[in-house]
Amino acid sequence: MSLGRYTRLDEIGRGSFATVYQGVHTKTGTYVAIKSVNLSKLNKKLKENLSSEIHILKGLYHPHIVALIDCQETSSHIHLVMEYCALGDLSLFIKRRDTLGDHRYTRDMIAKYPNPPGGALNEVVVRHFLKQLSSALKFLRDRNLIHRDIKPQNLLLCPSPSSYRSGAGSGAATVVPFKGCEDSFNPATGVDSLPLLKIADFGFARSLPATSLAETLCGSPLYMAPEILRYEKYDAKADLWSVGTVLYEMVVGKPPFRATNHVELLRKIEKGEDRIKFPEDNPASDAIKALIRALLKRNPVERLNFPEFFENEVITGPIPGLLADDQPSISRHRSVDPGTTEVPPRPDSRSGTSVPSGTRREREVNREDVYSPRSSPRNQKPSTPPTSTPMRRVGSTDRPPSAPKESEPPMAYPQRPNAVSHATAPGRQELLDRKATTTAIERQRSRNTYSEGSPRLDQPADKLKEEQERAAQDVAFERDYVVVEKRAVEVNAFADELAHSPRIQGGLSRAAQAGAISRRATVQGATPTLSSPQTTTGKAMQVFSGRSRADSTHHRQASYERRYGQSPTSATSAISKALNMASGRLFGMGFSPPLTITKGGRSPPLAYNPFPAYPTAHGSLMIIGDGAKSQVALDEDTKTVQVIEECATRSDVVYGFAEVKYKQLIPLAPSIQTDPSAKSNMSGVRDTAGSTDGDLTVDATVTLSEEALVLYVKALSLLAKSMDIAGVWWTRKNRGETFGDPVMSRADTTGALVGTRINNVVQWVRNRFNEVLEKAEFVRLKLIEGQKRLPPDHPSHPSNHSVTSSLGAGSTDIVVSSGVTAEKLMYDRALEMSRAAAINELTGEDLAGCEIAYVTAIRMLEAVLEDDEVPGLGPGKVDTSKDMYDGVPAEDRQVVVKLVSSIRGRLQALRKKLAILAKRAPTASVNV
């Protein structure tokens, strides 16, 4: 397949959204890597992030950074043409260290510098790679860039530069890569006869001044700095921790800290107390070990800083043990290219909408997927080897004159959108126990603790304070949603910990009848029915989509690999503001199971089903509190399960009510509009790509958006509480306070059932939360769009929003009309449903539907009364000394409590009537 000046060859890797091919420059025969990204799989936000990522890398030319050579966009794909690294990545290099002597490109290296039996790589090779890595990092730091995902999988290797000058020798390179710039394959440091290292995957890279602090959780867990794992603000020193872990792995052969899950990983780092141990037979020098220990300091203030790192003797000094043939000459031949002297010119033409050839980009959106072991270049055989190709690499003759070189002053790079947080980043136990109302305060305390020591200490106090304030302003936009993101990470970490706990898994095997609720692998793949990814552009919906999650088995591969998934970021600052606006609390987690709450509904319009669709697979989940009396005394564990399930069920009822509003905002697909039978089943696909609202007026759109938003936020709060209660239970369980006497077989069986049921709820809550966040973001955008379309004199028009009425400090603050609250909407709806059910009951119409309506009304009113205490008081049990409880006046709460009691009475009477009718039915059939 031809792509402009390149011919696409065999596939060498595949990711979630992209396929990587080996390619060759048509005229010169030099090799490239071509990543083809399928645009149909990208939502708008992922496209924007990809563009920003390309934009931030424009003008970055360095021999130890993988170059983006060209970028061509067609109607269906984006093709990224990158430098080809024939030796794969450093992780494969270390993994296959015992077979490097058989590879044509590394045979000579192993002959001169054999790998020691007690370590991973020869120290000469280790120091060589470290020098080249530090050269690239210094280049980035001079431009205020932080990579944020340094790991062996993102360090790509090319054959030694000398192999291109070996003629027809045994070590000569047969796959000559296309050059991104003049010095692409001329090392800035290190040994010319050893493989060339290049940093790839700038998916997490962003501009970060030296005194600024970031908060976004990103990176690969095994190599992630502890301050990121602790959800604290961090600076560029986070990269140095990652360098320390990579250096340790090159020396020892494995990462310094390993665990089965992220929570345990952080615990091991903390438990180690900066005592980095090496195997007794490890031959690494004291200088290397000292550097590793200086880099792997838990406290970033104590950690080696960049100037000290760049000036370390291991970086600046000669390499001990280097053979005479490899000793550096007086002047490095950086300008000498291998092969012939003639340089074929690079064409100036571009096909499609392409980025200038100077554009830089890392290898791909999903590095570890694309460069998997199966796609290692060592196993690749090019379809068309460039046997007669000039050995001189091309690509530098047509470099734009304005292309910045390394010697030029640092450029001003745009600040890219914040990167994705890993779906299973760890959450500390104390964070799981923390109440939502104190989360922001306590996190702010931890940030302040760190930020005091982060800037350079040699600056005057006043200047230091000034820079701290400026740094805080620089990341203020990020902080708005990072709190939500951290909450999301905590919840998902807890859900993963629970799902993969040996005790829970043991419970699953002993109590299989409980039936785990399976959850789908991806968000978009399971629910394309309500919103297309092109329209739902919010970060909130993208927290954890696109990667496989664990169901009831322990698959942890994705835990230690960064995956963009279907969407690269987590909850947005706007969602955070919406949450603040509507409930005063911050929530975040992610998921959405393919539930059928919209099927078989009776009223109101758009197939709203008043009965909760909360999953009750195999009777493992209980719904209580609807008037039925408890027949047995419940132990503490069973009560906990009931409280969690009740809270989740209430959230499901609120979610169903919000769906009514949401679906009216989405135009029906043409097939549903023309098919009457399809209109009765709203689980069909909806087209959200259009910008029209059907027959809705602007006022109606704004009203529906406001109501849907506050209802979704209420559902989020209930889901968050369910997870908090489960977190408290799990903490007690880990302290041995939950299951009782382990010797008792009955207690053990009960504990297994409890663990299984709670795990089912936790996984369901995680999935539902992601769906709610996704839809809340869509509604938020609809609300903003609708408010802008209102007449200028309308109270809800943005020009009429006062500073005091808006929440947040950004340009995307959300303002809802006065009186629009979830509690009022829920109360009115419950009252309407109960009245309609009472009328039908009196007339004897649809008694089964009356029962459903009564139960749903009770659940909705219980949600109004729900408090934030964990484990908290039940509905109706309120501290009467408070004038206001969760935004509801005490007098109003009493009215709601009385209404709940009244509906419970009607429900009991109705069920007695239904029982009598059920007994009569068999008798009547016999008589017939």
From Swiss-Prot:
Question: Which SUPFAM superfamilies is this protein grouped with?
Answer: Protein kinase-like (PK-like)
Q: Where in the cell is it found?
A: Cytoplasm; Preautophagosomal structure membrane
Give the Basic and acidic residues compositional bias ranges.
359-371, 459-470, 548-564
Q: Which reaction does it catalyse?
A: L-seryl-[protein] + ATP = O-phospho-L-seryl-[protein] + ADP + H(+); L-threonyl-[protein] + ATP = O-phospho-L-threonyl-[protein] + ADP + H(+)
Q: Fetch the Pfam families from UniProt.
A: ATG1-like_MIT1 (PF12063), ATG1-like_MIT2 (PF21127), Pkinase (PF00069)
Q: Which Gene3D superfamilies match?
A: Phosphorylase Kinase, domain 1, Transferase(Phosphotransferase) domain 1
One GO BP annotation of this record: cellular response to nitrogen starvation
Q: Where along this sequence does the record place binding of ATP?
A: I12, G13, R14, G15, S16, F17, A18, T19, V20, K35
Function, as annotated = Serine/threonine protein kinase involved in the cytoplasm to vacuole transport (Cvt) and found to be essential in autophagy, where it is required for the formation of autophagosomes. Involved in the clearance of protein aggregates which cannot be efficiently cleared by the proteasome. Required for selective autophagic degradation of the nucleus (nucleophagy) as well as for mitophagy which contributes to regulate mitochondrial quantity and quality by eliminating the mitochondria to a basal level to fulfill cellular energy requirements and preventing excess ROS production.
Assembly and oligomerization: Homodimer. Forms a ternary complex with ATG13 and ATG17.
Q: What is this protein called?
A: Serine/threonine-protein kinase atg1
